[in-house]
Design a protein with these regions (language model features):
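A cross-taxonomic marker for long C-terminal extensions/tails that follow the last structured domain
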Residues: 178-209
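Conserved AdoMet/S-adenosylmethionine-binding subsite of the radical SAM
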Residues: 3-173
Length: 209
C-alpha cells in the first residue's frame, strides 16, 4: 500500500526504485505477512537494475514458512544484503507472554539459515541477530542462552542488544538501564560471541540496576 492506501503491484514497486538507491530493506512491521509480494518485487527490482549495487535486506521475527524464508535468504545472499532475526526471548513461555506465539519456528529457522546459507558467504555478514532488552523480562540469563545458541553456529555472527523504550501496552516500564545493558553485553561475550554491541545507547537510563 502507498501513503494513499492504494494497492501497489510488485511490478510498480520495483519500477519505483530510484537509480541512487543501493539497498531495499524490509523492516519496521515484519515483512512475513506480505512476503510473496516483497519477494517478487525484490526479484523484479534486481532484474531491472542488473549492472549496479542493489542489496536486499530483511529484519524479521523469523516466523516465516521455511520455503519463503529460503527465498528471502537467497535474495540477500546473491545481492550482498543480509537478514536480521529479532530473537525476542529464549524461554518459550516468556516468548509467548511477550509475543503471543512460541519461538520454536524462529529458532528452527535461524538454525536453518546458519547451517545452509551462512557458509556460502560469511563476509560481509549474511545473518545477524538482535534482542530487545525489555526491563523485568529479558535479562542476562535470557541473553546468555540466546548468545550460546548463536555461537554454536558461528561466534562471528553479529549480535545487537537493543535498548527498550516504553510504548503501547508496556508504557509503564522504564527504558533499559545502562547496568542492565552492560550485564547483557558481558553475558553475550562470555557465551563466545565476538561481535556484540549495544544499540540505541541514547535510550539507556539509570532508572534501575
Amino acid at each position: 500500500m502507498t501513503h494513499t492506501s492504494r494497492p501497489v503491484t510488485p511490478e510498480e514497486l520495483a519500477r519505483a526504485v530510484h537509480k541512487r538507491i543501493a539497498c531495499i530493506c524490509y523492516f519496521g512491521g515484519d515483512p512475513t505477512p506480505f512476503l510473496p509480494h516483497a519477494i517478487m518485487a525484490s526479484k523484479l527490482a534486481l532484474k531491472n537494475k542488473p549492472n549496479r549495487i542493489l542489496r536486499i535486506c530483511w529484519e524479521t521475527n523469523g516466523s516465516a514458512h521455511p520455503k519463503l524464508l529460503r527465498q528471502m535468504v537467497k535474495l540477500s545472499l546473491e545481492s550482498g544484503g543480509c537478514i536480521k532475526f529479532d530473537l525476542k526471548a529464549w524461554d518459550e513461555k516468556l516468548h509467548i507472554a511477550l509475543c503471543g506465539v512460541s519461538n520454536k519456528r524462529t529458532l528452527e529457522n535461524f538454525a536453518m539459515v546458519a547451517t545452509e546459507f551462512l557458509p556460502m558467504r560469511p563476509q560481509p555478514p549474511l545473518l545477524v541477530a538482535s534482542t530487545l532488552l525489555v526491563p523485568g523480562y529479558v535479562d542476562e540469563d535470557e541473553v546468555s542462552a540466546i548468545a550460546n545458541f548463536i555461537a554454536q553456529f558461528d561466534p562471528n555472527i553479529p549480535y545487537s542488544l537493543l535498548a527498550f523504550a516504553p510504548q503501547f501496552y508496556m508504557s509503564d516500564l522504564p527504558t533499559t538501564s545502562r547496568t542492565h545493558a552492560l550485564r547483557c553485553l558481558e553475558a553475550a561475550k562470555t557465551a563466545g560471541l565476538s561481535r556484540v554491541h549495544i544499540g540505541n545507547v541514547q535510550l539507556l537510563s539509570s532508572a534501575y540496576h
